Structure formats: C-alpha cells, structure tokens
Amino acid sequence: MTVLIHVLGSDIPHHNRTVLRFFNDALAATSEHAREFMVVGKDDGLSDSCPALSVQFFPGKKSLAEAVIAKAKANRQQRFFFHGQFNPTLWLALLSGGIKPSQFFWHIWGADLYELSSGLRYKLFYPLRRLAQKRVGCVFATRGDLSFFAKTHPKVRGELLYFPTRMDPSLNTMANDRQREGKMTILVGNSGDRSNDHIAALCAVHQQFGDTVKVVVPMGYPPNNEAYIEEVRQAGLELFSEENLQILSEKLEFDAYLALLRQCDLGYFIFARQQGIGTLCLLIQAGIPCVLNRENPFWQDMTEQHLPVLFTTDDLNEDIVREAQRQLASVDKNTIAFFSPNYLQGWQRALAIAAGEVA
C-alpha cells in the first residue's frame, strides 16, 4: 500500500509546528501513514524536534504545489492529506484533474473554508475554489464547519475532526481553585490577526460593560504588526481608561499565555467564522466562558458538549457571566470531544480513511 503524504501547503509557522509535533509525539509510532510530510516554510529545527517524521520543506506555495501535482500524476494510488488548504494552485489542480478526488483529503482549518476576503483576486477565485471543493474525496472538520460545508457540498463525505490543540489534561480541574470576584477581566481576540476585528470587538465590549472591566488583547502574533497594534491601541484608549486596557505586543511562551488566560473571566470573539479553537479550548479548560458571534458555527460543537455559550447579540452583564462560569465549572472537562487526548481517536480514524484502510 502507498503511504499517505501529509501536506502543509502554506507557511503558517505556529500551526504547522503544532501539527508536526503532534504527529511526531502521538501518531507516528503507531501508523506508517503519519510520517511523511511536505511543508512550505523553513526547517528551523523542526526536523530535529520531530525525528519520527520524514519532512520535505519547500520555499513557497508554488514549488510545493508543483511537487504534489507531479507525485499525484506519477502514481494515481498516492493519497494526500491537506492540513488547511490555502494553496490556490492545489485547488486548481483538483479542479482540472491534475489531482484526482480519490487522492485529495482535506482537514478544514476555518479560514480556508469561508469567503470573507473582499479583494478582487479573492472574489474571482472563490467560485473556482467552490467548484474544486465539490471534488474533494473527504473533508474533516468541526461539527459546525461540517454543517456549513454541507450546505453547498452535500454530496462530499464529511468526518468529525478537531485541530490538535496543545493541552495538558491534568489542568482540566485548574479552574476549581480560583475565586472570581471584583472587576472582570475580558480577553479580546485570539491573536493580532486582523480577522479578530479588534476595534469592533472593543467597541462591543465597551457597549456591554462600559469602562468597568479590564480588557486584555493578545497581539504578539503574527510578527511585524506594529502599525495595526498601534491602531488598535489608540481605538482602545478612546473607549477604556489606560489602567483597563492591556495590549500585549510581544509573543508569549505557552506557560505565560496559560497564566494570562487564568486571570480572565470571559473570552470575547467577534469573528464570524470558526477560528481560534486553541484559545477557546484553553479558556474552557480554565473554566472561562466565551462570547461568540452567532455566525461562528463552533457554537454547535460547544453545545454538543453541553458547554455554555454566550453570543455577541446577548445582553451581557456580570451576573450572566458568573452564571456561565458556574455552569462551566459543573462540566466534566475530561469528556469534552475537542480536548486532548479525546481528539486522538478522531485522528486515528481520519488517517485510516485517508489512507484507504477503512471505507
């Protein structure tokens, strides 16, 4: 049997590193279909830190796509697992037959599914991408994204799968030893990416709570984002006093980020699509409820796991937030499907499907 090849077709260092380390640590030892990778980006020590994997690095999207297409044409039994699919050349290859549907398995990351960019080239490309998506052999995604995808592509097979968020299961009870009282602290957004719509989110928080809460905005990722960070800072200072606005412009190490999250009372995420599952998982693990846009279908995954969900359209106050905290504290977090290690079973099944080992 031909070994499955995994494709990380865009240079997204943080997510790519997370996937590679997860496969190295959790999957490679038990499946030959979890070891071969083609990745856009620099090695930066990844080969050394993932010795169980065979990783081929490419300088850009185009060179990787050309190599994938050549492999697909040379051996029609070769199957590929695309982790997040932001590479236009690969979509066009699927549409034109360069890659066959039986070779193309796609794990939806969120941004690669929704059509939110307003630029002309995106508007011209989206209809072609939609046509190509009809030819995918199988999609893997959250419950909400599967539902969203099925509205336009009902004939494409879909399987539940969660991004392998880095989590320590021993911290599932960490919320129980923190007393929540006094001024609330609200986390706004999951990164410095513009998709968080930080300024609109700050306005929404201010409309709900006024200048009575402390707002923390993590913007250390992506790099070279100083102009936008300053734009958000100035907008924030027009709404909140300096003592109530904390904008983090430096990237935090994982333990420092966890410590920051534990000081929060609420997460506020205004984006109208599924994103930031990693941050949501860590907040939920810490017993901190989240406010979501009703257009973000991840609320379906949360309610399926009996987790409280607040929406940006709700009338919010401290009593409602404290009640959501109480409800969240009563949930057995060891049973949540999108938590580690529970998502591991979904990955084992996804590998078997993509490799053709199970129907």
From Swiss-Prot:
The molecular function GO annotations come to: 4-acetamido-4,6-dideoxy-D-galactose transferase activity; fucosyltransferase activity
What family, per the record? Belongs to the glycosyltransferase 56 family.
Q: How does it sit in the membrane?
A: Peripheral membrane protein
Q: Which residues form the signal peptide?
A: none
| Localization | Cell inner membrane
Q: Does the keyword Glycosyltransferase apply?
A: yes
Name of this protein: TDP-N-acetylfucosamine:lipid II N-acetylfucosaminyltransferase
* Predominant localisation class: membrane
Q: Name one GO cellular component term.
A: plasma membrane
